[in-house]
Amino acid sequence: MDLQLPRGTRDILPEEVSKWHFLETEFKNVCENYQYEEIRTPVFEHTELFERGVGDSTDIVSKEMYTFQDKGGRSLTLRPEGTASVVRAFVEHKLYGEVSQPIKMYYNEPMFRYERPQGGRQRQFTQMGIEALGSDDPSIDVEVISLAMEFFRKIGLTNIKLVINSLGDKESRLKHREALVAHFEPHIDEFCAECQVRLHKNPLRILDCKKDHDNPLIQSAPSILDFLNEESVAYFENVKNYLNALEIPFEIDPTMVRGLDYYNHTTFEIMSVEEGFGAKTTLCGGGRYHGLVREFGGPDTPGMGFGIGVERILLALEKADIEIPAKKPLEVYVITAQPEAELKGVTLVNKLRQNGISAEKDYLKRKFKAQLKDANRKNAVYTIILGEEELQTGNYQLKNMETGEQEAVSETTILEKLSNTKGEK
């Protein structure tokens, strides 16, 4: 019997959780500053949702999904990405009927993909993302990009670059598709078996192939930018103008198509350019989608969003030597110097905690010196010593663990003393 972690998963131990809390808090604060509200969706959905939403020609659907049958014979899939579930909820709960548009939502949830585990890539991973539904204005595209860039600035990741592209509207993509088929078809035998299937199913996916990405025919493939109609060109120009107005630098990569079938018009990636982190490591990716709500049974509703892999962000912070704020420090360790002080120790610790002061005590009946050593090990700012004299007088010995200074403080003033000291920090 194998009782160890399944491959591609990991435990987040207590000493690591503060890093996750830091990212989650910063992301929440940035999103809510932009007036995005949190949404939470089920960890599994009907398989058809992802087949229709993500696209059955994508690697995600064809190779990476965790799919199973429940006891009722229904095909269910652990969610591999966030957008399809959010859009499904948008349609199912008729959020498109809301007076205030666009509907702006963010999420922070586990996703699952069966792929080879490596640095920053796990089979269970956490994705933070946003979706803005109900506006086809290019300014919302730039708001979404700006939010992502602001999040990276807040957490200290500045060695990054923004890469954008346009996939155009349906008319533009159809013309580009025809050109791709004509370009690849005479040489399709030079490509992997999957790309040979993709040629007539969805040739755009050939540009995104992991096996053939170095093939010169991909590098010389017709650019989508040459097939944009007048409307799509104008849309992309507006996106670029807004980015310039916000002084957000960007590069254009016409080969960037993203790994999902639902995108149109704007697509973007934010990449790390940190030395030693790997060339073009994508930290955030997203884009615009116009047909997904209709595909799920709702009215024509445009959308725009992105996803960020938390594990990859943590790795990027580590590579960049960015220090993440530590967990909340232990402010007071209450030392009970004799058994008779135990009851008072329990009530004092409880009183401190109820007043917002982080407090701890010994639970192993250790001797005085062992408790003092434990307080040091836990980096307590202060200790309060409860001995026979303290129990009789009601005055406690408050010791500053950094300076060694010690003073007697009455029970009635101890909370005020600690609160004042806390405010000075």
UniProtKB/Swiss-Prot annotation:
Example of a GO biological process term: histidyl-tRNA aminoacylation
PROSITE patterns according to UniProt: AA_TRNA_LIGASE_II
Compartments where found: Cytoplasm
Keyword Aminoacyl-tRNA synthetase: yes
CDD domains: HisRS-like_core, HisRS_anticodon
Enzyme Commission code(s) on record: 6.1.1.21
InterPro entries with a match to the protein in the record: aa-tRNA-synth_II (IPR006195), aa-tRNA-synth_II/BPL/LPL (IPR045864), Anticodon-bd (IPR004154), Anticodon-bd_dom_sf (IPR036621), His-tRNA-ligase (IPR015807), HisRS-like_core (IPR041715), HisRS/HisZ (IPR004516), HisRS_anticodon (IPR033656)
Catalytic activity field: tRNA(His) + L-histidine + ATP = L-histidyl-tRNA(His) + AMP + diphosphate + H(+)
GO cellular component, one term: cytoplasm
SUPFAM superfamilies listed in its UniProt record: Class II aaRS ABD-related, Class II aaRS and biotin synthetases
SUBUNIT field: Homodimer.
Family membership: Belongs to the class-II aminoacyl-tRNA synthetase family.
Listed name of the protein: Histidine--tRNA ligase
Taxonomy of the source species: Bacteria, Bacillati, Bacillota, Bacilli, Bacillales
